[in-house]
Structure formats: C-alpha cells, structure tokens
Amino acid sequence: MLFRSKKIGFVEKEEILTKREWIDRYKVFTPRANNIGTELNDDNFNTFVGEPGTICTESYIVLGANLGLDYESAENLRKYFTTRFARFQHSLTKASQDATSKTYQFVPLQDFTPSSDINWAKPVADIDRQLYEKYGLTDEEITFIENMIKPMV
C-alpha cells in the first residue's frame, strides 16, 4: 500500500528502488510539510503508524524504520511526536513548513518499548512532564516551550 498526499494507492514491490528493507517493518509516517516551528497553527495531526507492507511518497517522512519497532513501539513513537517537547526540538531547525530528516536532528531518540523509562500509556501532557524531568528542564524552560508550542487537541 502506498500513502501519498491525500491518496492511497498500490505499487508492485519490484518497482520500489530505494529502502526496500523498510517495506516489511513498522514505521511512522509524518507529513513533510507541517506548521511546527512556524507562526501558523501546528497541524501535526496526520502522523500515523505505517504497518508492514506500506510505503510512502516524498509527501511524508519515514520515522523509526531502522528501530525494529513492533506496533506498540511504533504507536509510542507516533505519540512522542505529539508532545510539546518533541515538537519544540523539531521546531529548532525549521525555517519554513518544509521538514526534512535534518529538521529532526535535535529530537532525542527514546526507548519506545514497554520497558522504557517513559510511561507511554499516560496522556501526552504527562509524557511531556516525564520528558521535562528526564532532561532536567527548569521551570523557565518548560514555560518557554509551553508558551511557544500549543498542545495537540
């Protein structure tokens, strides 16, 4: 199954020329164009888990394909990108709506498994608090992030 901007289609596996090894893995797809780090409302709502057998066009960025994720871990990765913490880190390198793999360079990699030091079963606001504590953020830094990055509704 092929995901592209606002459409789903099918393509033969033999037609895939790059990163074929990602096809049969869990991964997360997030739109390449998003408003994180811009003055516009954040619209990172279209991030979703790509199950084995799925691919995407350049309309999306693939996250976690090399992490050996199962469905639960992929869902935790997807949830991570709804946190203010991760979206703030992502915003640090963005000058426009366009995102590339390089715009994720300051987003720290986490353990997305059930044995993680982060309890991914909690609501996003609680996950943010766990991340703030893990990275030793001050009250001033937390306030700055929370004033700059709106919560996902």
What would you call each of these model-derived segments?
Residues 130-142:
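Short acidic, low-complexity intrinsically disordered linear motifs used
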Residues 1-120, 124-126, 133, 147-153:
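Polybasic, glycine- and aromatic-enriched phosphate-binding surface used to engage nucleic acids
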